[in-house]
Curated annotation (Swiss-Prot):
One of its GO terms (cellular component) is extracellular region. It is found in: Secreted. Its EC number is 4.2.2.2. The gene is plyF. GO terms for biological process: cell wall organization; pectin catabolic process. Keywords: Calcium, Carbohydrate metabolism, Cell wall biogenesis/degradation, Lyase, Polysaccharide degradation, Secreted, Signal. Its cofactor is Ca(2+). This is Probable pectate lyase F. Its main location: secreted. InterPro entries: Pectate_lyase_PlyH/PlyE-like, Pectin_lyas_fold, Pectin_lyase_fold/virulence. Belongs to the polysaccharide lyase 3 family. GO terms for molecular function: pectate lyase activity. It catalyses: Eliminative cleavage of (1->4)-alpha-D-galacturonan to give oligosaccharides with 4-deoxy-alpha-D-galact-4-enuronosyl groups at their non-reducing ends.
Length: 234
């Protein structure tokens, strides 16, 4: 069953507006396979013009944890990536070192994580606007920093979680996530946050077929496994 959710803290939408594009991954204008990560300098904009980028055949190693050097794009603080398709041949999609902006970034087949955000501080915001991701067996967005992640008009299909607050980072903190106008099909929970660290999640005008779109975890620090402890209200 499809539902529109307003979850912790509760926000009741005036009108439904699930605006994630459901027409599939855009047709690429070109295809580039690179042997090394592409870095986007702090504050700069990389407009791919709807080209597809990947790291070449065999790059994906399943759920083996990688780092920024394994990514297709590495965005420094304040950088923007837009109008791009991340191909299936990659271990990590996009890494952000600090807050970043992604506009119309599509992932045709997620390997480990599509988007990893780290080193953002409380009060800093990352924006993921439009775009979407397919076939993420675990997370689409992994948030390791301490700021706010805003996900607007995104599309997710066949996924484990859309955003997830880091469950076992060495240094833990409060994190915030805001999801609006997003469509999520054939997946698990839309949002996973750590109740014990004071995380907040707001879901507004989200269309999902998940039984429990927002899930609380008891996070931990280091070599440990977070535990699911309940469901966000809404």
């Amino acid at each position: 069953m499809w539902s529109s959710i307003a979850a912790f803290p509760v926000l009741v939408p005036v009108a439904l507006a699930c605006l994630g594009y459901e027409g599939g991954v855009p047709t690429p204008t070109a295809h580039h396979s690179n042997s090394a990560v592409i870095e986007v300098a702090a504050g700069q904009v990389f407009d791919a013009g709807w080209a597809k980028y990947d790291r070449g055949s065999g790059a994906c190693k399943g759920q083996s944890e990688g780092d920024w050097k394994d990514a297709v794009f590495y965005l420094h603080s304040g950088a923007t990536l837009k109008n791009v398709i991340i191909g299936a041949n990659q271990a990590e999609g996009v890494h952000c070192d600090g807050p970043c902006t992604l506009q119309f970034v599509w992932f045709e087949d997620v390997c480990e994580d599509a988007i990893t955000i780290k080193n953002d501080k409380a009060g800093q915001e990352t924006w993921i606007i439009g775009g979407g991701a397919y076939h993420a067996s675990d997370k689409i967005v992994q948030h390791n920093g301490c700021g706010t992640v805003n996900i607007i008009n995104f599309y997710a299909e066949d996924y484990g979680k859309v955003p997830r607050s880091c469950g076992n980072c060495d240094k833990q903190c409060k994190r915030n996530v805001y999801v609006e106008g997003t469509t999520a099909r054939n997946g698990g929970e839309v949002v996973g946050i750590n109740l014990n660290y004071g995380d907040t999640a707001t879901l507004k005008n989200v269309c999902a077929d998940s039984a429990h779109p927002c899930v609380f975890y008891d996070g931990c620090a280091g070599d440990c496994e977070p535990k699911k402890v309940g469901y966000c209200s809404g």
